Amino acid sequence: MINLLFAVIAYLIGSVSFAVVVSKVMGLPDPHSYGSGNPGATNVLRTGNKKAAIFTLIGDALKGLAAVLLAKHFGPAYGVDETGIALVALAVFLGHLFPLYHRFAGGKGVATAAGILFAIDPILGAGTLATWLIIAFFFRYSSLAALISAIFAPFFYVLMNGVDIMAGAILVISVLLIARHRANIAKLLAGKESRIGEKKKV
């Protein structure tokens, strides 16, 4: 029961959409109303406001990081076990994808997933981030970098820790992240996906 309680709290944390919050605070349009319609840092950047995009990126990553770290450090004292920590990781990610506060219209989860991975294991997070940076540098597609990183993340974890409940949670997160990039996959295959640095009008 305590595992589920912590998972619910994590979901509520994940439901805070920093793209929406930052946009409101900085007087920008609702990120659902322009570009890809995705409430994430990449879409916010299409307004031309780099600070807003950076704040969005940091906020989305920090909520994933904070939810898992808090559960890891304080949860055991209340009876939260490894299954509970895995549920928290999955729940905060689901909160980002389907936010309660924003009519369940959430983002794709790249930054939040990164925060979760760093909280689980800094080496895992760094390895996955390095994968993203390498793919992004050579191919200039943010979406492709995210997809490849999502594929490798579960393997990195298993190589380091073996197969356990957290490996299952990371696998589910990766599958969900890939599923959220369906439109990007179609554009990549059609050669129509935007490269990093290309600007789109809001």
Curated annotation (Swiss-Prot):
Keywords: Cell inner membrane, Cell membrane, Lipid biosynthesis, Lipid metabolism, Membrane, Phospholipid biosynthesis, Phospholipid metabolism, Transferase, Transmembrane, Transmembrane helix. The keyword Plastid does not apply. InterPro entries: G3P_acylTferase_PlsY. The keyword Iron does not apply. GO terms for biological process: phospholipid biosynthetic process. It catalyses: an acyl phosphate + sn-glycerol 3-phosphate = a 1-acyl-sn-glycero-3-phosphate + phosphate. GO terms for molecular function: acyl-phosphate glycerol-3-phosphate acyltransferase activity. GO terms for cellular component: plasma membrane. It is found in: Cell inner membrane. Pfam families: G3P_acyltransf (PF02660). Its EC number is 2.3.1.275. Its main location: membrane. Catalyzes the transfer of an acyl group from acyl-phosphate (acyl-PO(4)) to glycerol-3-phosphate (G3P) to form lysophosphatidic acid (LPA). This enzyme utilizes acyl-phosphate as fatty acyl donor, but not acyl-CoA or acyl-ACP. HAMAP family: PlsY. Probably interacts with PlsX. Belongs to the PlsY family. NCBIfam families: glycerol-3-phosphate 1-O-acyltransferase PlsY. This is Glycerol-3-phosphate acyltransferase. It comes from Cupriavidus metallidurans (strain ATCC 43123 / DSM 2839 / NBRC 102507 / CH34) (Ralstonia metallidurans). The lineage of its organism: Bacteria, Pseudomonadati, Pseudomonadota, Betaproteobacteria, Burkholderiales. The gene is plsY.
